[in-house]
């Protein structure tokens, strides 16, 4: 084979053609990677910019013209635009400390001075729904994954895996109506203390949604454990259950923890199920029978509303989204740290 024609069978006539094609593929891959980085950066910039506008929304602007700045003493006063004469009510200023530590969320009802923006009322609803969902998804997902990986016959596995994948492909709005029309009446049949909208029904539906995620990822982690570890356990006289729980699961703990944290992030960011089944009354509660509102539920309510883009109530959507972004990012970083720690331990 001539140096200028190393790969004639693949259609390349010269080294220059090979290098040109390789450079093109490399450039395309680099552009895709750069696009993902720029998209993430743009999301972060938009979130934090709009959240900053929320905390600076004590400034009243009319068609780009500065009108006045609100203070705690002047909140609720009426001012007029010097250009068009339009009337504006000065909003009560919201500090970051009041937002992040407040427990009352009431931005839609009452005067401007009565509006409350305590994000813990929304965080509590998100936490209780996520907790119920994880109580369903984590144990059932782990048990299902162990069964599929260690016990199930290949024919049974070939039937169960597509079923789980179908569950993962069902639209979340279907889960929301299922929670509202099936799970809630079932809960009320066993206990009449459940409201029509409640956190338990939403949490159960979100848990069913996350079950395929947990089981699939955990099974992949279990399948990645070397066969030699299992054979060593059997050689020592261990039973299948002992090998599964004392050898395989600890060896796959890195992937298992990553699956759990990914599922938690999924539950925290779930939108349609909680918007349909949990309710829209934000208040600080840990009673799973009560209606509640999550952070994503509030964002949906504001996105579908008729508030002005300069209104403090509308801008609160971005402040809540920033808190949600920080929570999910913290979970992702924690997942990477846990995965690296246990990976080093078992390698």
Residue ranges and their predicted role:
Residues 1-33, 335-347:
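Transmembrane alpha-helical segments of polytopic membrane transport and secretion proteins
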Residues 12-23, 28, 48-133, 153, ...:
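Periplasmic/extracellular loop-to-transmembrane helix junction in inner-membrane transport proteins
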Residues 219-223, 227, 234, 261, ...:
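C-terminal transmembrane helix and the adjacent membrane-cytosol boundary/short C-terminal tail
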Residues 41, 45, 139-144, 163, ...:
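Membrane-embedded alpha-helices of multi-pass transport/permease systems
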Residues 189, 274-325:
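Interhelical loop and adjacent transmembrane-helix boundary motif
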Residues 165-210:
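Generic hydrophobic transmembrane alpha-helix motif, especially the helices
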Residues 217-218, 225, 234, 240-278:
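Transmembrane alpha-helices
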Residues 26, 140-179, 217, 345-347:
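Cytoplasmic-entry segments and transmembrane alpha-helices of multi-pass inner-membrane transporters
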């Amino acid at each position: 084979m001539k140096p200028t024609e190393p790969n004639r069978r693949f259609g390349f006539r010269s080294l220059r053609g090979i290098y040109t094609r390789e450079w093109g593929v490399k450039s395309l891959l680099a552009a895709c990677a750069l696009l993902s980085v720029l998209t993430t950066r743009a999301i972060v910039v938009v979130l934090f910019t709009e959240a900053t506008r929320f905390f600076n929304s004590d400034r009243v602007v009319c068609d780009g013209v500065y009108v006045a700045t609100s203070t705690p003493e002047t909140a609720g006063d009426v001012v007029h635009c010097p250009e068009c004469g339009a009337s504006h009510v000065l909003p009560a200023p919201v500090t970051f400390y009041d937002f992040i530590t407040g427990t009352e969320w009431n931005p839609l009802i009452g005067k401007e001075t009565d509006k409350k923006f305590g994000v813990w009322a929304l965080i509590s609803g998100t936490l209780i729904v996520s907790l119920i969902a994880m109580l369903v998804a984590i144990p059932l997902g782990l048990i299902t994954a162990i069964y599929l990986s260690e016990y199930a016959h290949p024919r049974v596995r070939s039937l169960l895996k597509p079923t789980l994948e179908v569950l993962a492909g069902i639209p979340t709005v279907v889960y929301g109506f299922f929670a509202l029309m099936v799970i809630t009446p079932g809960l009320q049949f066993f206990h009449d203390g459940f409201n029509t909208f409640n956190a338990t029904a939403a949490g159960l539906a979100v848990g069913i949604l996350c079950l395929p995620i947990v089981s699939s990822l955990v099974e992949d982690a279990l399948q990645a454990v070397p066969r030699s570890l299992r054979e060593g356990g059997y050689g020592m006289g261990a039973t299948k259950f002992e090998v599964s729980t004392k050898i395989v699961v600890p060896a796959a703990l890195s992937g298992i923890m990553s699956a759990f944290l990914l599922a938690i992030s999924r539950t925290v960011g779930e939108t349609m199920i909680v918007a349909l089944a949990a309710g829209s009354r934000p208040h600080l509660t840990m009673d799973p029978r009560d209606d509640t509102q999550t952070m994503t539920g509030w964002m949906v309510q504001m996105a579908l509303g008729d508030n002005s883009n300069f209104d403090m109530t509308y801008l609160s959507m971005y402040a809540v989204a920033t808190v949600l972004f920080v929570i999910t990012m913290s979970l992702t970083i924690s997942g990477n740290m846990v995965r690296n720690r246990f990976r080093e331990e078992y390698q």
